C-alpha cells in the first residue's frame, strides 16, 4: 500500500517527502484555505516537491463548471489529479475527464455503491472517508473491505485511497483491507514512526554504550 500525505502545507509536505515514504499528495479547498495563499500557486509548488500524483479539487457543482476547472488544473502539471465530489454531476465530469485523458479522484465516498459508480464512470481513484463514517457510528474500514472485494471481483482498475485517516491504526487496517493507498495527515505519519518500546530500546543501547566509554 502506498502512502500519500493529506495536507496543503508545503513545509509539512517537504518534511514528509524527506522521509522517503510519500508517493503523492491530496489536498482539498479547506486545506488550501488554511494556508491563506493562491490555490494554483500552492498546487504548483507542491508539484515541485513531490514527484507523484497531486490531487486538486474542483469547487463547481455542475459538470460543465467542473470540467472547466479540471482542464485548467490539469494544465498546471502532468501529475495533477482532479478531485471531483461524488454526485451525479460529478460522475458526468469524471467520464468527461477520462475521455480527455485527465486523471480523477472521486471524493466524499461513503458507500460501496458510490465507489462502484465512480469506477464505472472512469475514475482513476476513489476516496472513501474512513474517519467520518466512524464518527457517525458506521464502519469506515468495513467500507474499504467492501469496495476492495467488489473491485477485485470485476478487475476494476480504479484504485482505492483510504481517506479521512484519524490515527495510525486506520492506516494498518486500510492496508489489511486492500486499499491501494492511504492518505494521511502529517501528524499521523509521524505517529506511525513512533513506538514506546523503540524509544526504550534506544535508551537502553545508549546507556549500555555509555558504560563502555572510558571516563575522563
Swiss-Prot record:
Keywords: Cytoplasm, Pentose shunt, Schiff base, Transferase. GO terms for molecular function: aldehyde-lyase activity; transaldolase activity. The active site is at 83 (schiff-base intermediate with substrate). The keyword Transferase applies. InterPro entries: Aldolase_TIM (IPR013785), TAL/FSA (IPR001585), Transaldolase_3B (IPR022999), Transaldolase_3B/F6P_aldolase (IPR004731), Transaldolase_AS (IPR018225), TSA/FSA_arc/bac (IPR033919). It is found in: Cytoplasm. It comes from the Bacteria. The keyword Disulfide bond does not apply. Its EC number is 2.2.1.2. CDD domains: Transaldolase_FSA. PANTHER family: TRANSALDOLASE. This is Probable transaldolase. NCBIfam families: fsa_talC_mipB.
Amino acid at each position: 500500500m502506498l502512502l500519500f500525505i493529506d495536507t496543503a502545507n508545503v513545509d509539512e509536505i517537504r518534511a514528509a517527502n524527506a522521509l522517503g515514504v510519500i508517493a503523492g499528495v491530496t489536498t482539498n479547498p479547506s486545506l488550501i484555505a488554511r494556508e491563506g495563499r493562491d490555490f494554483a500557486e500552492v498546487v504548483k509548488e507542491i508539484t515541485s516537491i513531490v514527484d507523484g500524483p497531486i490531487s486538486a479539487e474542483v469547487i463547481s457543482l455542475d459538470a460543465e463548471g467542473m470540467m472547466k476547472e479540471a482542464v485548467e488544473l490539469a494544465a498546471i502539471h502532468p501529475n495533477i489529479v482532479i478531485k471531483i465530489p461524488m454526485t451525479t454531476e460529478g460522475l458526468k465530469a469524471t467520464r468527461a475527464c477520462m475521455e480527455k485523458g485527465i486523471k480523477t479522484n472521486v471524493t466524499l465516498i461513503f458507500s460501496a455503491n458510490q465507489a462502484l459508480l465512480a469506477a464505472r464512470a472512469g475514475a482513476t481513484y476513489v476516496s472513501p472517508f474512513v474517519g467520518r463514517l466512524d464518527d457517525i457510528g458506521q464502519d469506515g474500514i468495513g467500507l474499504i473491505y467492501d469496495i476492495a472485494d467488489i473491485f477485485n471481483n470485476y478487475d476494476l482498475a480504479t484504485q482505492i485511497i483510504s481517506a479521512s485517516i484519524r490515527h495510525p491504526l486506520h492506516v494498518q487496517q486500510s492496508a489489511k483491507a486492500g486499499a491501494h493507498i492511504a492518505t494521511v495527515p502529517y501528524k499521523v505519519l509521524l505517529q506511525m514512526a513512533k513506538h514506546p518500546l523503540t524509544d526504550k530500546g534506544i535508551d537502553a543501547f545508549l546507556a549500555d554504550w555509555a558504560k563502555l566509554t572510558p571516563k575522563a
